[in-house]
Amino acid sequence: MLNCRNLSKKFERTLFNKLNINLEKGEILAITGPSGCGKTTLLRCICGLEKLDSGSIFLNGKEITDSPAEVRNIGLLFQKPVLYPHLSVSGNLSLASRDNHDKALIEVGLSGFGNRDVYTLSGGEGQRVALARALLANPRVLLLDEPFSALDSDLSLKLINDVRALLKSRECPAILVTHNIEEAELFSDRILNLLDSIN
């Protein structure tokens, strides 16, 4: 499904070097490491927001290394949900698709939230809206950049379980980056420590 070969990137120092990642259909990988080690940069390279120094990325057997981000069909969920406060929940979902809003909101546990103002949402609700929007675009892979870290522990645990179950039911492969090893163990099928990729 997603095949990353010999990915390398450095700024003042090496972030990752000749890193290989293979992700099968429905598989969830967690990438761990301390803050500032390059986890977010890796996700940005995979989805096309940053350039690699070297290496190749394949999706369903097709090379996408030099493809623009908008044609890769890779979803990205951030630590802080990127929502537009002047739009309703449904208005935010319309940025991904004009259809199936009710179904998407039911899927993420927010039935009936379509007409809500975004500024009235809690942190967990906002993250669920961002997830619904990402999934409405039917991404071939979903990348998650510490989406649970800003939530309290009980809310974070529920969201981890709900998002994992949803991704598994859709057979959507995903990569989570986190510095929290417990979170990684709960959410993923396997774990990669990014520091291990630096040779």
Outline where the language-model segments fall.
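Hydrophobic anchor residue at the start of the ABC signature
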Residues: L131
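ABC ATPase NBD coupling module
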Residues: E63-K80
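Catalytic Walker B motif of ABC-type/P-loop ATPase nucleotide-binding domains
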Residues: L142-E146
